[in-house]
Structure formats: C-alpha cells, structure tokens
C-alpha cells in the first residue's frame, strides 16, 4: 500500500544506529497512536511495543517483531529518499520490516473485533549488534507471549514468494 511505502521511505531517510533510534521510535509511536493503538514506550531504551487485544475470547498472545536499527554505512544509492544521516543507512531492510509491521498493525487494529487473544507488535531496537532483544526479555515485556514471529526481506527470493527458514 501507499502508506507502507511512505513509511518505508521516511524510515529509510531517517536511518539511525543501534541504541540511537530515538527519531525512529518517535515516528513509530506517533503512527501507532494515530491509529488508536496502545503503545508501550521506554524511558531507558528505544523501540516500542504496541498491543492489540482481540474482541473475541482467547488467552493466547502472539508477538510480531520487526527490527528498526540501521548500519554504519554511507549511502550512495541515489534514491530520492536516501539517508539524511551521513554514514548511516538501512542496508539490511529494517526500514522495510518496520514499515510492513506498521501496515500489519493497521490491518490487525481494523479487524481487532474478529481476533481471539492478543497480538503484540515489537519494534525492536539494536538488532544489528545482537543484543536488542535481551532488554525486552529481561524486563519481562514478553513473558505473556505464546508464539513469536518475525520476517526479513530477502533480495534473492522472487517477488511474491514466501521463504520459510527452520
């Protein structure tokens, strides 16, 4: 959708390194709150968790996760939405992941009365340095999660194809 592409372009243009995703987090929180989705923010960490409670009975919680940090690489792509931060770019698809999760948030929120149980949406900081998830786990924010899923864009996979990894 156009909204997902616009979010991806914004996030790509405003790429931030691990633990420095303040502008990214603020953008995600603002977009989620505009939809009406409750969002948990953290005073001591970047990233956020949105929670969508279904309108039907159910006691399971599913987590959908997207990473939000960028890499310390100078962008020379020439695209009109290239990173405005010198030496920092989304070269691994995290802008796409976060934008797609925002799109999923909208769809889930709009159909929440049909959902049984709860869906948590984790916009995870600091994935590129392999420690970002520990914060959310160690603080107990994911204790009620029964199943978790993430995704990653894969440039060698054909468009429209789903690749599942073990």
Please state what every model-predicted region is.
Residues 71, 79-89, 96, 113-166:
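Histidine/acidic-residue-rich, glycine-tolerant segments that coordinate divalent metal ions
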Residues 1-90, 99, 103-115:
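Acidic/His- and Gly-rich active-site-bordering loop/insert found
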């Amino acid at each position: 959708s156009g909204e997902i592409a616009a979010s991806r372009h914004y996030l790509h243009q405003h790429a931030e390194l691990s633990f420095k995703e303040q502008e990214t987090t603020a953008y995600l929180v603002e977009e989620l709150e505009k939809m009406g989705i409750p969002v948990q923010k953290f005073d001591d960490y970047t990233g956020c968790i949105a929670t969508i409670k279904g309108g039907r009975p159910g006691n399971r919680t599913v987590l959908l996760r997207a990473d939000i940090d960028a890499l310390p690489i100078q962008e020379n792509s020439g695209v009109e939405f290239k990173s405005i931060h010198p030496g920092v770019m989304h070269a691994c698809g995290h802008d796409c992941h976060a934008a797609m999760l925002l799109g999923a948030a909208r769809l889930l929120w709009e159909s929440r009365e049909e959902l049984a149980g709860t869906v948590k949406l984790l916009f995870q900081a600091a994935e590129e340095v392999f420690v970002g998830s520990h914060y959310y786990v160690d603080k107990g924010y994911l204790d009620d999660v029964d199943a978790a899923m993430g995704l990653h864009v894969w440039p060698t996979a054909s468009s429209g194809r789903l690749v599942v990894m073990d």
